[in-house]
Amino acid sequence: MNLKAVILNCNQYEDSDELVYMVFAIKLNDKFESHSEAIVLRLTFEEMEMNLKDIQNSKCPGFEYFLEMNLIQDLYEDIRLLEEYKSDDEKVKRIIYYAEFDS
């Protein structure tokens, strides 16, 4: 799955009292791209307390932390109706920008 697909389908994931979804992706030329390979991990709260590097090394070697799914969902909802982010590509680029520079 690529990062664009994960972002555009973010509402398919719902955290629970026991599980949280977190997105990891592969950087291309030192940055995330819409076509970067991505993985959505379902983590327990106990796993969430682990160091991010430990999660990466044990569950998705070669991938880097992108964002927690609930944050992607909040961002997507915030920009969904804004005029400047009409296309899916613009929405995806904005969320990637946030992950790299604002989070």
Across the structure, where does each feature detected by a protein language model lie?
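Amphipathic protein-protein interaction modules
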Residues: 39-100
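Extended, charge-biased low-complexity segments
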Residues: 1-55
